[in-house]
Swiss-Prot record:
This is Growth-regulating factor 1. Residues 139-149 have a biased composition (Basic and acidic residues). Highly expressed in developing leaves. Keywords: Activator, Nucleus, Transcription, Transcription regulation. A motif (Bipartite nuclear localization signal) lies at residues 125-135, 153-160. It comes from Zea mays (Maize). Residues 120-164 form the WRC domain. The gene is GRF1. GO terms for molecular function: ATP binding. The lineage of its organism: Eukaryota, Viridiplantae, Streptophyta, Embryophyta, Tracheophyta.
Length: 408
């Protein structure tokens, strides 16, 4: 393309470059005429006619100017070392929240700071629903999300409630059966006043009947269980079995006299001894003299028997002190005082009964008031004779009734 000659001149080239630069900067800058009249003013008029009028460019909006002034004030507080007032900080925080929502959008209900939980539109209402549109209309409990009706509905109620209150009070059935035996409790509670250890009787029934007498020194108020019929012996077996089970379970104390006096005693031997004595006592109780065959009214000098046994007292109902010797007499010096007390009481009782024992006839055949049936019973073989157990401590009188009728 051939260019005109005039455009090659330096002056023409300079004018062309200036006009092109002015035309390109018109939309962004406000051009002012260099002179009131001249070629440049006309060119500006032509450029303004060709391009629309450009609006003034403002660097900040009014809100940005206000925020800038606020930040400048906060900066002055920071430089001065004075705490920034909260009314200057709160608007900035709100502006940041609005900026986050503008750029990142509104968080959906299933996500965000609640980590998958949905926002409750009615916080004070029970949250029990059926999974659809229905929701409980009652108010929720203070410390729960549900009302009183729906609070425990989510738990499995098919099982029976566990009784936690009875758990610490429960005990093994064997221990419960042992604790229910009153003679054993009485025997365990009996203590001696001087020695300081528990004195368990060999026979729990005797210890239960004596009260506070225990097994040592209580010969004055001991009522023998062997003077009764087979019912008393069965009760003795039950009480002794309860004591054996109690000792086998470890309930007996370490100072139980049956096991710690001279070594461990066999339970089988002790049980066999009890059975033999019970059979012997049952045979003796069957051969007791009936109350009608030996009335006390016929013998006024035997009035002391009325004090011992009442109206129905017989010869066989006299206290059997021989079998009720203290079972713990092998203890030695610890029970010496108890033995002395028991022998003294037995001797006193023997002296009380002495005045009529000597007056009795030697042979049973000469006893008045005995019927033929009683006489036939008296002529029984000597193996089953009636043995009266008189205390051995009273050695100053002889037992005449212990002799057999055949030994005249």
């Amino acid at each position: 393309m051939a260019m005109p000659y005039a455009s090659l001149s330096p002056a023409g080239a300079a004018d062309h470059r200036s006009s092109t630069a002015t035309a390109s900067l018109v939309p962004f800058c406000r051009s002012t005429p260099l002179s009131a009249g001249g070629g440049l003013g006309e060119e500006d008029a032509q450029a303004s006619a060709r391009w629309p009028a450009a609006r003034p460019v403002v660097p900040f909006t009014p809100a940005q100017y206000q925020e800038l002034e606020q930040q400048a004030l906060i900066y002055k507080y920071l430089v001065a070392g004075v705490p920034v007032p909260p009314d200057l900080v709160v608007p900035i925080r709100r502006g940041l929240d609005s900026l986050a929502t503008r750029f990142y959008g509104q968080p959906t209900l299933g996500y965000g700071p609640y980590l998958g939980r949905k926002l409750d539109p009615e916080p004070g209402r029970c949250r029990r629903t059926d999974g659809k549109k229905w929701r409980c209309s009652k108010e929720a409990a203070p410390d729960s999300k549900y009302c009183e009706r729906h609070m425990h509905r989510g738990r499995n109620r098919s099982r029976k409630p566990v009784e936690t209150q009875l758990a610490p009070q429960s005990q093994p059935p064997a221990a419960a059966a042992v604790s229910a035996a009153p003679p054993l409790a009485a025997a365990a509670a009996a203590t001696t006043n001087g020695s300081g250890f528990q004195n368990h009787s060999l026979y729990p029934a005797i210890a239960g009947s004596t009260g506070g007498g225990g097994g040592v020194g209580g010969s004055g108020n001991i009522s023998s269980p062997f003077s009764s019929s087979m019912g008393g012996s069965s009760q003795l077996h039950m009480d002794s079995a309860a004591s054996y089970s109690y000792a086998a379970l470890g309930g007996g104390t370490a100072k139980d006299l049956r096991y710690n006096a001279y070594g461990i005693r066999s339970l089988a031997d002790e049980h066999n001894q009890l059975i033999a004595e019970a059979i012997d006592s049952s045979i003796e109780s069957q051969w007791r003299l009936p109350s009608s065959s030996f009335p006390l009214s016929s013998y006024p000098h035997l009035g002391a028997l009325g004090d011992l046994g009442g109206q129905n007292s017989t010869v066989s109902s006299l206290p059997k002190m021989e079998k009720q010797q203290p079972p713990s007499s092998f203890l030695g010096n610890d029970t010496g005082a108890g033995m002395a007390m028991g022998s003294a009481s037995a001797k006193q009782e023997g002296q009380t009964l002495r005045h009529f024992f000597d007056e009795w006839p030697k042979a049973r055949d000469s006893w008045p008031g005995l019927s033929d049936e009683t006489a036939s019973l008296a002529s029984f073989p000597p193996a089953t004779q009636l043995s009266m157990s008189i205390p051995m401590a009273s050695s100053d009188f002889s037992v005449a009734s212990s002799q057999s009728p055949n030994d005249d």
